[in-house]
Structure formats: structure tokens, C-alpha cells
């Protein structure tokens, strides 16, 4: 494909908040340039997982190459790199931005600028991208283009005099967008003669060909007969094929600086071809990789257990396969007295966790029990060593540790003014430290807080949405660890510690959480033939307790009248049996009980 000069290449991506119409806009661009015929077109063409279409979110990055005849009569090649909009996947966004020279900033003309839009715009500005503002959904009755333009100018500082108004649904403004991509986004630098470097911005697992890597050639060129070297993992591979996505894969002989394509080289696992890694040639390798590569670090952990113990090998196989296509997923085997064998898994965030869980249940037909999510705590021991704890049940005893530090995030919430008070209340309930409050426009405000990540991962998002009728949006990033007075709260069911219910909480909140937990468990655990005590404890001190009364069979039903000693004998016999059951009986804890821990509004 080297017949197109670099000057006529354009690489761009679309930045938007969830639901602002990014995937629909991508569909229209593909249709307008004739890349996909109207017959093959389907909604959200670039979102190919069912789950993505169903939730209406983009999870994996996609790319498409379009040929476009501009107003000057020349043929241009436009590479669209689709990005996920969700905060959990911000690392993937930053990598795809590095592969572009420009971005379309899509803002919903009825809703205005939202949190994730801003987070991604700042990433784009860091990468020196040319940003073209686009107002989408102008056909809606509630659209107010002028107000939104002012909002973009005051919040982001972009000149919106040339902003394009469009409606991806009806096709208004699509030709103007394509023309402005050609006119305003700069072509890639012409670095054909430098040593080859290519940036991996996505990879996925194909069960026939192994890992398919999507990359952008930054300098030099790659041809089908080359032997490649991945610089982070130091592994080399023979190429099987390289090609372009238009949007179906088409083989080509070579790709040069500025072009975007895919390659397959019988790579076994996605972890070998990490997003952000640099591809170079074995024979003429680059001296240093492209900047910015980091390994995805999991922030949220939870236990996954099969409801049926026989499914444990299937769960292991399913996780192995998922990890081939999801390099950010980490897991290790774990056993628990209450739940049997399972895995402790690490995720980028709550959405990532839900998606993995849903894919396991849907694609691999597993029934899972998921324990409450937790974060990584840093425990400073008395001997001076530091432990990282991701499972609350493994927290060392108080006499062995000096202090516990927990991760903090800086959270920015964008919302209409009238919800200011209720949001500040929510952040204070969650142990947040107030940092700043900015009025963006006369009726919108940004609140900035520093909050422990553990308070954000459970149900902060749901509460924020319900308190603001869905109008608020948020964005957060990790800022480091801070020491706090944290304790381990254990739950004892029938005097046995239930590991999956163990949580780490702030000492001030321990009583409330413990009280709430045992009350909730009392509602959810079915009665047994014997009395079940439920207790919440910190170390050996019980701070809250409830008990589930026994189901009682009426053993006196068949005694009509008669002597009292007969009745006493039967009651004594029953009491003896109950005592034996209590010492031997096991209590089955239903899945709802574990989920109750999540729902306990901290």
C-alpha cells in the first residue's frame, strides 16, 4: 500500500463520553466513504462483541481505513482509530491517541461536556493532537448548540467558531467532518528512512491465527517477509501476514511510516504483545522503544468461585482463554472455607470486573459467586517490611503491623449546580477531602475531591447518579497511598469466620458496617433446625451480633394430656439433638448474602 504518499494520510480518533454517539458517527463515516456498503451495514459496526452492542459501550479498540476523495480531487487515506470512552480503559485510550495526529471531539448538543470527555481531551492535548470539535445530535429537540459551544470554550479552551454541527443518526454534517479531517489534521511525519518502530495500540486473540496485533508504523516500514522483535517482552517472531483494516482485514505486502495495519505472527497470548509495546525489526532494530509503555495494573480485586465445585477446572480454562485476549486481567487460585476452590482476580475497575464476569457466564456457561470487591492495601509491618494485601482475609494481625495505607484517588465530578450540596454530602460520607470547586458555566460545577479508592469501588457511582437524577458524571485517577486508621472486620456465622465477607473498614465506620452486615445476613440466610449466631468482630472483640432462631418441630403434638414427665423427656431429647446438630451442622450461605455486602451503603 505504499503508493499513497505520506502527505495524503490522516490518522484520527474520536473522543466522546459514553452515549454521545461515537460509534454511530463512526458508522456514518464508514458509509459516507463507501468503506462499508449499505447492505453490510449494521448498527455500531466497529463494536463486534455482543456485549459491547448490548451495553452500548466500546470495550476493545477498533480501527478502520477509509479512502476519501477530497474537494481538491485528490484521494486521501483516512485511518479511524475507535477508542473506548470508559474511565476503566483510559490506558488503552492514551495508547490509541499516541497513534493519531488528530481527534474529533464529539459532544452531545443536548448534554454538553462530560467528565470522561474532558479526561480524554487532556490526554489528547498532552499528545499534541489537533482537535476538531463536533456537536452531535443537533436534530434533537433539546439541542442547544450555542450554549454547548460556549461550554467547550470555557472548559477546554478550544476555539469553537469552526465547530461542526452534525447528526450521526440522520447523516447531517458528515461530509463536512470528512473534509475538515483532511484540511485540519496534519499528515504523519515522513520518517521512512529511520529504523522501524511501530506502536501496538490493540491486540486480540483469534483461535485460528493466534494474536492479531493492530499497530501504527511510526518510523521506517514493515514488510511481510520481515522478522519482528517486540521490545518490552524481547520476543521475536516470523510474520505470517500483514494487512490493513477496511474494516475487514485485507492482506498487503508492506506498510510504511504513518500507516495503520494489523499483523499476525503466531503469537500465543495477548500478554506477549502488550498494548503500548514497540515493534521493531530483528535485523535493523531501533535503539530505544517508543515512550509511554506501562503495564496495566489492576486496581480492584474480588474472588470468583463456581457455585458447583465440579466447574472449577472449567473456570480455570475460561480465565486462561479470557486472559489471552485481555492482558489487564490478573488471577491466582484461592481457597475459602465457606466457598471451596476459586480464583482471586484483579481488574482495572468496576466496569471491567462486571464485563469479565458477564463474559465468563455468557461465553463459557459458568455459574459464579463473586465476593465483594476490594483494593490493594499497603501494610507496614513492625519488622520494617511492607506487604501488599489485595484480599482482606489475609490482613496480618494488629500486633504484627505498624500501620495500613490505602490508595486514594482524585475524583472530579461534573454536575448541574443544584446538586452541589447533595454531592458534597456524598463525598464527605465517603471520607473525601475537599480540594476545589469550580463553576464552569453559570449552571454547571466541577467538584474535586480526594477519596479512598475503597469508597469509590463499591457503589459510589450508583449513588452519585441517583442523587443527581443521572446528570452528574465523574472521572478519577490514582494519586498514591495514605495512612489511615483501618481495621479488619470479620463476620462469624455459627462461630466460623466467613472469609468472603471479611472487609477492611475505617475504625469510625466499623460499628455501623458490622451492625448493617449482621442485620442483612439475618434476613438473607434461611433458618436451620438450630439457632445460628451471627457476629461481626474486630480481632477478638465482638462489635455486633444477631441470631437466626431455629425452626422448631412440635414434638409434643402427639401427646394429648398425660403426664408432664413424658413431655419433658421429649423436649429434652429434642434439645439434645439440636445441640448435636449445632456442633456438627454447616450453614449454607446464599449468593445474595455476599452481594449484600456490596449493597451496604458504606
From Swiss-Prot:
- Origin species, per record, is Prochlorococcus marinus (strain SARG / CCMP1375 / SS120)
The protein's job, in short, is: Required for accurate and efficient protein synthesis under certain stress conditions. May act as a fidelity factor of the translation reaction, by catalyzing a one-codon backward translocation of tRNAs on improperly translocated ribosomes. Back-translocation proceeds from a post-translocation (POST) complex to a pre-translocation (PRE) complex, thus giving elongation factor G a second chance to translocate the tRNAs correctly. Binds to ribosomes in a GTP-dependent manner.
User: What is stated as this protein's family in its record?
Assistant: Belongs to the TRAFAC class translation factor GTPase superfamily. Classic translation factor GTPase family. LepA subfamily.
Out of the domains of life, which is the source?
Bacteria
**Residues annotated for GTP binding in this entry:** 19-24, 136-139
Positions of the tr-type G domain = 7-189
Task: Tell me what topology the record assigns in the membrane.
Answer: Peripheral membrane protein
**Which PANTHER family does the annotation name?**
TRANSLATION FACTOR GUF1 HOMOLOG, CHLOROPLASTIC, TRANSLATION FACTOR GUF1-RELATED
**Main subcellular localisation:** membrane
Q: What class of enzyme is it?
A: hydrolase
Kindly list the organism's lineage: Bacteria, Bacillati, Cyanobacteriota, Cyanophyceae, Synechococcales
- Tell me the keywords, alphabetical order: Cell inner membrane, Cell membrane, GTP-binding, Hydrolase, Membrane, Nucleotide-binding, Protein biosynthesis
An annotated GO cellular component of this protein is: plasma membrane
Catalytic reactions of this protein? GTP + H2O = GDP + phosphate + H(+)
Q: What is this protein called?
A: Elongation factor 4
Amino acid at each position: 500500500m505504499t503508493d499513497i504518499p505520506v502527505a495524503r494520510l490522516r490518522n484520527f480518533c474520536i473522543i466522546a463520553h459514553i452515549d454521545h454517539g461515537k460509534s454511530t458517527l463512526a458508522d456514518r463515516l464508514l458509509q459516507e466513504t463507501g468503506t462499508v456498503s449499505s447492505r453490510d451495514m449494521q448498527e455500531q459496526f466497529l463494536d463486534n462483541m455482543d456485549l459491547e452492542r448490548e451495553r452500548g459501550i466500546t470495550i476493545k479498540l477498533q480501527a478502520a481505513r477509509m479512502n476519501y476523495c477530497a474537494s481538491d480531487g485528490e484521494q486521501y487515506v483516512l485511518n479511524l482509530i475507535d477508542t473506548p470512552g470508559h474511565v476503566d480503559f483510559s490506558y488503552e485510550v492514551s495508547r490509541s491517541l499516541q497513534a493519531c495526529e488528530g481527534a474529533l471531539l464529539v459532544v452531545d448538543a443536548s448534554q454538553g461536556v462530560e467528565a470522561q470527555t474532558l479526561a480524554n481531551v487532556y490526554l489528547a492535548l498532552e499528545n499534541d493532537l489537533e482537535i476538531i470539535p463536533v456537536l452531535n445530535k443537533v436534530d434533537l429537540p433539546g439541542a442547544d448548540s450555542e450554549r454547548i459551544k460556549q461550554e467547550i470554550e470555557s472548559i477546554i479552551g478550544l476555539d469553537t467558531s469552526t465547530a461542526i454541527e452534525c447528526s450521526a443518526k440522520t447523516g447531517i454534517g458528515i461530509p463536512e467532518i470528512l473534509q475538515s479531517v483532511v484540511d485540519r489534521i496534519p499528515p504523519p511525519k515522513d520518517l521512512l528512512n529511520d529504523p522501524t518502530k511501530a506502536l501496538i495500540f490493540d491486540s486480540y486473540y483469534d483461535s485460528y491465527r493466534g494474536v492479531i496485533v493492530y499497530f501504527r508504523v511510526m518510523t521506517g516500514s514493515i514488510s511481510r517477509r520481515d522478522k519482528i522483535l517486540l521490545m518490552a517482552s524481547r520476543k521475536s517472531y516470523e510474520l505470517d501476514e500483514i494487512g490493513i483494516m477496511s474494516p475487514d482485514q485485507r492482506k498487503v505486502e508492506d506498510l510504511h511510516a504513518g500507516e495503520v495495519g494489523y499483523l499476525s505472527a503466531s503469537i500465543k497470548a495477548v500478554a506477549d504483545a502488550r498494548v503500548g509495546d514497540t515493534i521493531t525489526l530483528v535485523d535493523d532494530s531501533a535503539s530505544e522503544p517508543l515512550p509511554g509503555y506501562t503495564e496495566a495494573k489492576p486496581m480492584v480485586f474480588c474472588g470468583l468461585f463456581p457455585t458447583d465445585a465440579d466447574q472449577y477446572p472449567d473456570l480455570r480454562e475460561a480465565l486462561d482463554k479470557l486472559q489471552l485476549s485481555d492482558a489487564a486481567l490478573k488471577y491466582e487460585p484461592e481457597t475459602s472455607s465457606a466457598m471451596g476452590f476459586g480464583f482471586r482476580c484483579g481488574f482495572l475497575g468496576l466496569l471491567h470486573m462486571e464485563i469479565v464476569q458477564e463474559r465468563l457466564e455468557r461465553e463459557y456457561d459458568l455459574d459464579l459467586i463473586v465476593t465483594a470487591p476490594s483494593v490493594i492495601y499497603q501494610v507496614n509491618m513492625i519488622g520494617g517490611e511492607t506487604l501488599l494485601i489485595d484480599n482482606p482475609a489475609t490482613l496480618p494481625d494488629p500486633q504484627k503491623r505498624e500501620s495500613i495505607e490505602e490508595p486514594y484517588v482524585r475524583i472530579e465530578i461534573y454536575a448541574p449546580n443544584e446538586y452541589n450540596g447533595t454531592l458534597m454530602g456524598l463525598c464527605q460520607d465517603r471520607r473525601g477531602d475537599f480540594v476545589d470547586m469550580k463553576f464552569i458555566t453559570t449552571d454547571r460545577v466541577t467538584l474535586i475531591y480526594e477519596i479512598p479508592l475503597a469508597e469509590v469501588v463499591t457503589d459510589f457511582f450508583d449513588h452519585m447518579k441517583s442523587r443527581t437524577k443521572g446528570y452528574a458524571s465523574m472521572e478519577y485517577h490514582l494519586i498514591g497511598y495514605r495512612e489511615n486508621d483501618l481495621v479488619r472486620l470479620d463476620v462469624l456465622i455459627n462461630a466460623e469466620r466467613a472469609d468472603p465477607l471479611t472487609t477492611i473498614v475505617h475504625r469510625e465506620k466499623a460499628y455501623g458496617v458490622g451492625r448493617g452486615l449482621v442485620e442483612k445476613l439475618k434476613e438473607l440466610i434461611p433458618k436451620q433446625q438450630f439457632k445460628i449466631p451471627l457476629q461481626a468482630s474486630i480481632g477478638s472483640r465482638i462489635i455486633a451480633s444477631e441470631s437466626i432462631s431455629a425452626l422448631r418441630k412440635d414434638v409434643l403434638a402427639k401427646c394429648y394430656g398425660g403426664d408432664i414427665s413424658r413431655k419433658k423427656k421429649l423436649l429434652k431429647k429434642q434439645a439434645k439433638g439440636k445441640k448435636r446438630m449445632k456442633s456438627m451442622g454447616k450453614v449454607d450461605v446464599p449468593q445474595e448474602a455476599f452481594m449484600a455486602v456490596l449493597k451496604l451503603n458504606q
